[in-house]
Amino acid sequence: MIRMEEDFTNVDVLNADQLEVGDLIGIGGEIVKVLAIAPLHYGFNLAIENNFGEKDFVDVREDDTFKLYIENF
């Protein structure tokens, strides 16, 4: 089942250093799940998965912020 943005509620805004594995965050206009976090000298490398099951890596700076979402039931 494809989840749409209305299936989620924005509950907070997190700094990059507050992210945890399993968080649902907004990146690039979509809501993705954080699969892994690796520190870099300027920030973090995030392994992410979108709602189509596509996985990717994205580098973020330590001063970047992200909307945190929870699923609506």
Range-by-range predicted roles:
Residues M1-E20:
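Mixed-charge, Lys/Arg-rich low-complexity intrinsically disordered regions
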Residues G22-I25, F66:
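Generic structural signal for buried aliphatic residues
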Residues I31-V60:
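Basic/aromatic-rich interaction segments and small domains that mediate binding to polyanionic partners
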